Amino acid sequence: MFKKKNVSLAVVRRLPRYLRYVEDLLNHDIMRISSSELSQRMGYTASQVRQDFNNFGGFGQQGYGYSTQVLYENLVKILGLDKNFKMIIVGVGNLGQALANYANFYKKGFRLVGLFDVDPQKVGKSIRNIKIQHIDELKDFIKKNDVDIGVLCVPSEVAQEVANLMVEGGIKGIWNFTAKEIEVKDDVVVENVHLIDSLMVLSYKLNEKLLEKQEASQK
């Protein structure tokens, strides 16, 4: 598959949204869509849609638009969802348990293969038929099972320590839900998820709406 080097992160972050929408089109038996229709429904410009897809070869045909099936298959490959990445969760508190029970991981091709914690009240119990193991077993488990992704749901004060254990075990990517900005070697990919950041963005948008109403009422 053709792919430009150094695709911007902004483009990459739009790809899951494209995939969700195209999947919905297929579920409604819509087999073709133009860039203008796609852009209108998603809130982007047609030029933006074409530029995004051109980073990976384009996928469209002039005068025809996009085959939703072809678009879906290409987006799945671009996002690596055909790789069936193996995933573990470290820290089985409220967030870790919620993620462990999230069925969409399986639907999108991610395989949860391990759960880890230090709490003796949790170790030995199971979630979705996956036994919670003590963190002392983490490194060996990663090595033996060739785990790809480690999900970090531990307290921030131990985040770097646990990340180090993951890396020593041979983890390839870390999905970091802690407030700590962890440091890892260059060949390990990190995606930080700060839930409060998204809430603050919502707060900003809500505040803007309130200010607009206040200004309108004063005119």
UniProtKB/Swiss-Prot annotation:
Key words, A-Z: Cytoplasm, DNA-binding, NAD, Repressor, Transcription, Transcription regulation
SUPFAM superfamilies: NAD(P)-binding Rossmann-fold domains, Winged helix' DNA-binding domain
DNA bind region: 17-56
GO BP field: negative regulation of DNA-templated transcription; response to redox state
Binding site for NAD(+): G91, V92, G93, N94, L95, G96
Pfam families: CoA_binding, Put_DNA-bind_N
Free-text function comment from the UniProt entry: Modulates transcription in response to changes in cellular NADH/NAD(+) redox state.
Subunit and partners: Homodimer.
Record-given protein name: Redox-sensing transcriptional repressor Rex
The encoding gene: rex
